[in-house]
């Protein structure tokens, strides 16, 4: 993989990418750690679900708003302050034992003050590489993000089982502060100044590529939410974690194999269609553990390439300030999409049968493919790959 090596050898790339992953590692643990801790503290899955929902809503609302503040406050000051506030709220959740409503409020604060690490990193990436390396860098970034979702839940479970759920949530708080500070101290970030956007808040949504990204991400991630809930319902809690992990494994492989190959306007449609193949496969044997595992692996092959392609398209379509806001809207779409897909699948399961979740997964997958098809004309051509690829 000579071109991936060339990207990593560029000054600052490894430093920014590595510290970004550490700063965001808490997000990989967040869902499971909060559910385990709040349920154990208050003995109620309902309260645990509300707590996680509050955090998700907070993060969805704050994404684009915080991205707009990067030019006014400066990325280092903003993300450092946000990480400190969010981590303080996490520590409150970890150690508070009073009325549950205060934990819900604290979880909302956690979401509202989640530092926009990924938006900052993706906005600064294009300044660290040559134009022909764009697809490689965003493919590498999207692929490595899967590590958060592979190891985050595992670590949350291990710490909770070995020590306590309190220790798991407290660990997230510490990792977030330390990782964010390491990220913020990078010279590429510490001295970074975002030019003020000439657009009003939400102005980037007037550009068709942003609408395309929001639609595709919302529907695609909604299919993942439904798939996760369905997998747990059909197979049970214990095997579900491993089976869902194969989707991330497929995404890791797909990211390195295909993510950098995006060039044409139709690349996004091709990669989203790969996920649809996996979603259709599951109907052949909808309750078999091995077949579901294989199906989710195929789904994963298209995940990282899809996210990498979308990130690359945003990078070549906007300047730093506007790209950060655009990534914020995409993050909001993903959060709302996952929550919506999971909720719809849960309702369908409760009122019909467990494997009915696959119909929700398939429907959302079809919506993602159609979104990619009808918005392909708005996609920019991506820079040609390096000749040694």
What role is predicted for each listed range?
Residues 2-58, 204-247:
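Helix-loop boundary and gating motifs at the non-cytosolic
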Residues 34, 115-129, 305-318:
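Intracellular juxtamembrane helix-capping segments at the cytosolic ends
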Residues 61-75, 160, 253-267, 349:
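Helix-to-loop junctions at the C-terminal end of transmembrane segments
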Residues 77-91, 170-173, 267-281, 362:
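Structural signature of the two symmetry-related core transmembrane helices
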Residues 108-147:
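Cytoplasmic helix-loop-helix junction between adjacent transmembrane helices
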Residues 161-174, 347-366:
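A membrane-interface helix-boundary motif in multi-pass transporters
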Residues 267-310:
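C-terminal transmembrane helical hairpin of 12-TM major facilitator-type secondary transporters
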Residues 322-353:
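A late C-terminal transmembrane helix in Major Facilitator Superfamily
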